[in-house]
Amino acid sequence: MTFSRRSFMKTAAATGALTALGRPVLAQGIRWDMADEYGEQALSGKASKYFLEQLNAKIGDALTITYQGGGALGYNSVDHFDAVQDGAVQAAVTLVTQLGGIDPFFNLSSLPFIASTPEEAMMLWQAAREEYAKIFEENGMVLLWAMPNPPSGINAPEPITSPEALEGLRIRTYDVNGTNTMMNAGAAPLQVAWSDLIPQLSTGGIDAVLTSADGAMQLSLWDYVSDFTELNYAMGLFMCHVNKDEFDALPEDVQTAIMEILPACDEYNWSIMVDSIQTAYDTMEENGMTITLDDDVPAEVFEFLQEAGTSVREDWVAQTGERGQAVLARFEELKSQAG
């Protein structure tokens, strides 16, 4: 009889004992890895640390999850879906807007200007969470929590204060939505993975970067560009997802403990995202970067980018059909209720 790694984990979980405290343990313990393309100082890393701390407080060493940040396991976000689905790694924190090729619904959170504030980004997550969870479940995974990126802006050699500033700009984008929007705006976008960004800047492959202020701070982009323009373009979501076979193999009270801490994780993640914005601005200015806030960006720039993103939003609705329409309707309802 041949035993796969998954069947072994199920058997091990089923034969585990309980400590006197009622915490489930196994003879060898249950150990997982959690992949993250980004590092422990990035917001995805901080969100992962909080999740692991909260889990440890509830279950002790019944489940040990090792955070593997900075692409330590050799996976980028675009690889995580297959890696977790196949059981090559038990868990991952993934920038899901890079998974649009698997299901276009994943592109929702990076639709240009759909959510313009952290509060709206939370409402969009609440409106769409059920559909996200369904996609993961249908592919052998369990969705846990989300971590929003701070609003994206443009790091460039000069502020983006006119549509002409985008013309021919060789700009890094992080997903298909950004690529198509920037192309429509007359720029020359190139989708570049996080790990390849600095080499591209160093060799002149790109001149500008579409990312958040926190991302700019993490990469010390002041070494390459002088300006950050606040555009509140999008707040793409990271999501933590785990292999369903591995999750189902856990003792029931461990599964329950994981699910119980998820609301606290979302609340914490949104709070650190909001706090990160001013922290990043302060650090960038201390290192010589000029920050152009959205109030100082001419209205014509936003109107121009809104127009450039119109077809991107329309295409997403066409690709996702009733699913997309239903989620957008729920999103508008939540916004209306919030006043």
What are these regions, as identified by a protein language model?
Residues M123:
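Short beta-strand-centered segments that line the small-molecule binding cleft or hinge
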